[in-house]
A protein has these predicted regions:
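Active-site acidic carboxylates
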Residues: 1-117, 144, 148, 169-177, ...
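Aromatic/hydrophobic pocket-lining residues that form the small-molecule binding cavity
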Residues: 35, 39, 135, 161
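Short, well-ordered secondary-structure micro-motifs
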Residues: 66-67, 124-127, 163, 188
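Short, surface-exposed loop/turn motifs that are enriched in glycine and acidic residues
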Residues: 92-97, 124-131, 154
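Histidine/lysine/aspartate-rich catalytic loop segments that bind and position anionic ligands
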Residues: 107-145
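Glycine-rich anion-binding loop/nest that anchors nucleotide
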Residues: 147-163, 177-182
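Buried hydrophobic packing segments
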Residues: 164-168
Length: 216
């Protein structure tokens, strides 16, 4: 059995609006053209080695609750209370059908692309479920494929990568996060995210190490 047969890869939100390369509306520092190429090259190698590839895609309606533009008097990056929940407000990003929402890797290499954040009432950092608890098809897809272990990376370390990795672990998968194939919004929250993931039993590797991934 090849090492990758029961191992899946989730590439998180590698979309134009999250990159400095595409001058995205919610660009993550360091997510430049070189970083995107590094992620694309690593993802191609995982494919060659028999890993099953999945992607998440932020896919918001214009009326999405997380957009500061939908909250008169509020500004991006403010936190507000909505129905008892704390909601961080963001610039409009990854609006359905826009260039900024497009995945920057070849879509053809993925077994499936799981869209998230389509419900205007709830944010969705995780590829498994939104903040309201509504599940995506991710867990069903992975279990149908017999995936037991997941390699997770992308944008951003301290938000959607962390949320996806934590939910993957909660759903019973062995999870490995590749720090060098991810970028975070801020250094302090990124460091905290890495520690939080480790505390939940998630393995964090600095870079791709096929032997360690196979052994974990």
């Amino acid at each position: 059995m090849r090492a990758g047969e029961k191992t899946g890869v989730i590439v998180v939100d590698m979309q134009g609006d999250f990159t400095t390369w595409k001058k995205g509306t919610l660009a993550v520092n360091g997510a430049d053209e070189g970083f995107v190429k590094k992620v694309a090259d690593a993802t191609a190698i995982f494919k060659e080695k028999g890993f099953v590839l999945y992607a998440t895609q932020d896919w918001h309606p214009k009326s999405h609750i997380s957009f500061a533009s939908n909250h008169p008097g509020s500004k991006p990056f403010e936190a507000v209370k909505i129905d008892g929940r704390t909601q961080v407000l963001w610039p409009d990003h990854c609006v359905q059908g826009t260039d900024g929402a497009k995945i920057l890797l070849d879509a053809g290499i993925f077994q499936a692309i799981v869209k998230k954040g389509q419900d205007p009432k709830f944010d969705s950092y995780s590829g498994f479920q939104d903040d309201g608890g509504a599940k995506t098809e991710m867990d069903t897809l992975l279990k149908t494929a017999g995936i037991k272990k997941l390699v997770v990376y992308g944008l951003a370390t301290d938000y959607c990568v962390m949320a996806t990795a934590i939910d993957a672990a909660a759903n019973g998968y062995k999870v490995i996060v590749i720090e060098g194939l991810s970028k975070g919004v801020a250094p302090d929250t990124t460091a905290k995210a890495l520690e939080t993931m480790k505390a939940k039993g998630i393995q964090v590797l600095k870079e791709v190490d096929m032997k360690r991934i196979g052994d974990l």
